[in-house]
């Protein structure tokens, strides 16, 4: 940036920096020092930086947070050993052995396969609803 043609000026409460190009000849007469002082003294807005809260500490500490933590979690899930399906069913084998359909099959195979939706509740509901129509 050409310090003679442009200088930076502080404007507003939020400390935003504005570049102005007018009054070039007047500043040349004053000299470059005033313009350079303006540039050095101006407060720039706080731009968030990635790991600024860690200071100039080690790289290992930066890796404990943010993206690296998320990436480690994904890698651990991917590398986790897949358990066999038989191992996960072992606690249930006793209950599965006792499970039978004998009581349901006594009624008849057709009724056991397709239980009726009407168990008497529909009649009660229709009797309640018809007077309201």
Curated annotation (Swiss-Prot):
GO terms for molecular function: RNA binding. A motif (Nuclear localization signal and RNA-binding (RRE)) lies at residues 59-82. GO terms for biological process: mRNA transport. Residues 22-66, 104-133 are annotated as: Disordered. Residues 51-66 have a biased composition (Basic residues). Changing residue 25 to A: Slight loss of RRE-binding. Residues 22-31 have a biased composition (Basic and acidic residues). Changing residue 28 to A: No loss of RRE-binding. Changing residue 19 to A: Partial loss of RRE-binding. Residues 13-27 are annotated as: RNA-binding (RRE). The RNA-binding motif binds to the RRE present in incompletely spliced viral pre-mRNAs. This region also contains the NLS which mediates nuclear localization. These overlapping functions prevent Rev bound to RRE from undesirable return to the nucleus. When Rev binds the RRE, the NLS becomes masked while the NES remains accessible. This is Protein Rev.
